[in-house]
Amino acid sequence: MADDWRQVCETYRRAITLSDVESKNDPENEPYRSKYRARELLREVRVLLCPEEEEESEAEGKEERRDGPESGGRRGESGELLAARLAVVEFRLGLNHTETEEMSAGEEHLVKSGRIMERFRLSEEGVSVYIQAQNNLGILWADRGEIRVAQRYLESAESLYYQYMKEIGKPAIDPDEHFFSEEQKLTEQERTKRFERVYTHTLYYLAQVYKHLKQDEKAAQYCHTTLQRQLEYDSYNPVEWAINAATLSQYYVTKQCYMESRHCLAAANVIFSKAEQIPSAEAAKENEAEQERLDLLRQKKAEIARCWVKYCLNLLQDARKKLEDNIGELDVDIQEELKAQRQKEEDEKEKDRKKAILFGSSDIYDSVQAAEEKVECSHPLDFKEAREVFLVGQNYINESKEYFQLDGHVTDHIEIIQDHSSLFKLLAFFEEDYERRCKMHKRRIDMLEPLCKELNPQYYLLICRQLQFELADTSYEMMDLKVAIGNKLDEMDTHTIKKINSLAQTAIKYYEMFLDSLRSPDQKFPEKLEEDVLRPAMVAKFRIARLYGKLISTDGKIQLENIQKSLNNYKYIVDYCEINKEAIKCIETELELSKEMVALLPTRMERLRIQLASFS
């Protein structure tokens, strides 16, 4: 009997080695060679466990008989133990079939594994294999797009874990341990670690399911718990963990939970640094695998950096929304009010919330806290505070650009440059000095303009439109600032007038480039604008109209031409909305002003014509 059992164990372990280790070296033309051999060995194990049964029906037949597995199989074994061993073999066969893309057969074995263990699912021998079968059925149904079915399996696994821990609480036996010799048996500590890892997988898959079901808050909670447990049980890949934590931070950003977001990002930095030593470029040149690994690490580091950039951008953006008045300028009264209120609230809030979200144990706590202290999580309320957030964001911009370069990563690189531009735009809001604010906007033009000139609209039409519109907006904003500076002078000097005109003409140029991109191949402007470009196109028309009105000229004829161009653009908006009533709701403010200008400008033009006639 002992020799028979030794043969069973050796056959099972050989199957696992083939499946988990040797399969990695299978040739490309036989990618599943080791998996198929492992399957044959697992079937042998099943026959050895139940020699008197038909191979295809022994496990199911035993469970369906009144007495269950104890009524047959190897003499002297308890029904519970035999059931557990059979369930493990069925579970492994289920995995084997899913790994070789035979999903229906895989499902059949996984369901059979669960059915065998149904009565014993709360036992030390059975709980782990039962939960793992449920987990894998959840994955299988999720891959089929049947998310609700996946949810039922995974929530069943979660519920069983809670019930087992409440009613039994002992370290569960790992499935493979059923085929270990006495000397190979796991310690209670190792059993606990493996069982908790199984449950962590349940939570991880549930997080994905809730995300698919648009239950974002629940998905975030499960993701957070998964990350905490992976640290607690030292069961994680540092790079994957860091990416998942950085991704979770973006959810917290959308909820304006900046302390939680910062904590996730700081922890991501600390755990990412635990990834193995990045190989030198020289070593990578000699080893293709090392080169791939180096590239992956650089990419993931850049992705985490981009999450930090989004954190800084959103923190500044939300601060701006709190502080701006009805014309988009910083409201000093609100600023003082928020400063007074912040100190009272922040300390208590941080203390309470931190208890709920802390990652990891004392060994990484200090490092995470040090990373957190490099950037605030409360809204900046003045230029000094905003600049500190800006500098952190800019540092991560530079870090992300190291990997996402224009050559090879066009879209990503341009998004990063656009984020850099947005950082300058948000910082400019906090700057009181108009000249310094202009310089910040000039930095934006300097970084965006070369990209706009370099990209071919034939291949990057949407990106080109974004750049054209942002360049136009930035020039428009600079012109407004220069007008405000000029208005403070007793008399506007020639240099200021030239600058205002130059900026206005640049803004007009880019708005018109944007509008031209909407034309058909035969250069006709669309009679009806698509919904996604309707508001941008109307805003462009409105601002072109206003810009022509801002151009300064001493030549009456040029003044008349500019007013006419201004009128034409205002009139376009009014006429378009007259024909397309549904457009009114997205352009209400601009439409009202356009109607006023359409009524006023002809009178102004007539007065100017009379003046010109009197001088001729």
From Swiss-Prot:
Bias (Basic and acidic residues) ranges: 59-78
Chain residue ranges for the region called Disordered: 52-78
Keywords per UniProt: Cytoplasm, Cytoskeleton, Developmental protein, Differentiation, Neurogenesis
Presence of keyword Iron-sulfur: no
GO cellular component, one term: cytoskeleton
Coiled coil regions in record: none
Location of this chain's protein in the cell: Cytoplasm, Cytoskeleton
Keyword hit for Cytoplasm: yes
Cross-referenced SUPFAM superfamilies: TPR-like (SSF48452)
Superkingdom classification of source: Eukaryota
InterPro entries named among the record's database cross-references: KBP, TPR-like_helical_dom_sf
Segment forming the signal sequence: none
Function field: Activator of KIF1B plus-end-directed microtubule motor activity. Required for organization of axonal microtubules, and axonal outgrowth and maintenance during peripheral and central nervous system development.
Family of this protein: Belongs to the KIF-binding protein family.
Name under which the protein is recorded: KIF-binding protein
Species the sequence originates in: Xenopus tropicalis (Western clawed frog)
